[in-house]
Structure formats: structure tokens, C-alpha cells
Amino acid sequence: MRVLVVVLALLLGGFQYAFWFGQNGWNEYQQAKQEVSQLKETNQKLTARNQLIQAEIEDLKTGINALEERARLDREMVKPDETFYRIVPREQR
């Protein structure tokens, strides 16, 4: 009977060791869980960025106002009979 108890205790100890420290054990599970969490956060940021870019693309495809705004800001274009003024901060003078 004692031998059986000792064998069962050793088996239980072996299983516990494998669970906590072995391959695919608790430590690796926690590391994988943290990595998944970080990847989800990165994916959320990228999804938000993609949605903004998609909205801008749709706006450029359908609306003339977006094209005009882009031309004014990026290319500094003006309409006929319009004057463009650039205000330079004091630090850049």
C-alpha cells in the first residue's frame, strides 16, 4: 500500500512539474497570452489607421471638396483671383 502511495505521489509530482515548468507549461502559456494581447492591440491600431485611410480614399473618389482641400494644403494651390498668404512663425525667420 505504501508503495502505491509513493508511486502515486511521484506521478502527481511529475505531472505538476510538467504543468508548471515543462514544454507548453504554465510559463509558456503566460508568455503566449501576453504576446497575443500585444498583437491584438497592434491589430486594433492598424485597423483604425486602415479605416481612416479608407475613408480618405472614399472621400477623394466621391467629393470635390476633399480634392480641393488636398490641393490647397499639400500643393499650396489657389483658385483664380485668390491670394495665398503664408504666415511664418518667428522661430523660422
UniProtKB/Swiss-Prot annotation:
What is the designated name of this protein? Cell division protein FtsB
List the HAMAP family hit by this protein, alphabetically. FtsB
Q: Name one Pfam family in it.
A: DivIC
Known function: Essential cell division protein. May link together the upstream cell division proteins, which are predominantly cytoplasmic, with the downstream cell division proteins, which are predominantly periplasmic.
The UniProt gene name for this protein comes to: ftsB
Species of origin: Glaesserella parasuis serovar 5 (strain SH0165) (Haemophilus parasuis)
Periplasmic face residues: 22-93
Q: What GO biological process terms does the UniProt entry carry, in alphabetical order?
A: FtsZ-dependent cytokinesis
Q: Which stretches of this protein does UniProt put in the Cytoplasmic compartment?
A: 1-3
Which keywords describe this protein according to UniProt?
Cell cycle, Cell division, Cell inner membrane, Cell membrane, Coiled coil, Membrane, Transmembrane, Transmembrane helix
Q: State the GO CC annotations.
A: cell division site; cell septum; plasma membrane
Membrane spanning segments where?
4-21
**What subunit structure does UniProt give?**
Part of a complex composed of FtsB, FtsL and FtsQ.
Q: Which residues are in coiled coils?
A: 26-76
The topology of this chain with respect to the membrane is:
Single-pass type II membrane protein
